[in-house]
Amino acid sequence: MAFFQKLTGQEQVNRDLLLLLCIGGFYALGVSLSNTFVNIYLWKQTGDFRDLALYNLAVVTMQPLTFIVAGRLAKQIDRILVLRLGVSCLAVFFVTVLLVGSRAHQYLLVLGALLGVGYGFYWLAFNVLTFEITEPETRDFFNGFFGVLTSSAGMIGPIAAGYIISSLHGAKGYTFVFLAVARLVSCRCAAQLFLEAPRGRGEIFIFPHFKGTE
């Protein structure tokens, strides 16, 4: 804690802030390891770019729809629960990819929708928790350090994954990478179990301009 307090100018760095950084770091590394290579893995199975287009269309369609649902749940239930739902969906996605293996191309829309739902729940909750857990004095530190983690993961992940896939024959490299990502998701699951967010104050509106008057 003392090291982080020096970085923030002797401001108090609480446990939840560090846990949120860990969760974000694990997420960034997992995404950087897998994002490009999931598409390549699916393309190698079908050889048709239209299938990849359908897969990614399912991802980007479900993500904003999930944002709306996640916003309602975050207000009415709990932001931590929404975060857990997101992490759980991402875990199920990678476990499913590992289980179906060479038959993954048969479930493109299901996999894409599952990933989009995971992204939607995760990012809504993460952004809300970032605002709630950090204080004005520690927010710059959080955003800066999170940027370092994200950038580092973005540089290391694709290189490491590419090396592993090219070093192992056949689909073994992809299986190894996806298994590593599944383990990173497990680490996120473990970290978020210890996360405690303060009770929300005020109201969360997905479309503030449509707020009714009292």
Curated annotation (Swiss-Prot):
The highest taxon in the source lineage is Bacteria
An example GO CC term for this entry is: plasma membrane
Which cellular compartments is it found in?
Cell membrane
- Asked if the Swiss-Prot or TrEMBL record annotates the protein with the keyword Membrane, the reply is yes
Looking at the UniProt entry, the stretches that span the membrane are: 18-38, 51-71, 80-100, 108-128, 145-165
SUPFAM superfamilies to which the protein is assigned, alphabetical = MFS general substrate transporter
GO MF terms held by the record:
transmembrane transporter activity
Where does the protein principally reside?
membrane
Which of UniProt's keywords are assigned here? Cell membrane, Membrane, Transmembrane, Transmembrane helix
Entry-linked InterPro entries: MFS, MFS_trans_sf, Sugar_transport-like
The protein's topology relative to the membrane is: Multi-pass membrane protein
- Please report the name of this protein according to its UniProt entry: Uncharacterized protein in sodM 3'region
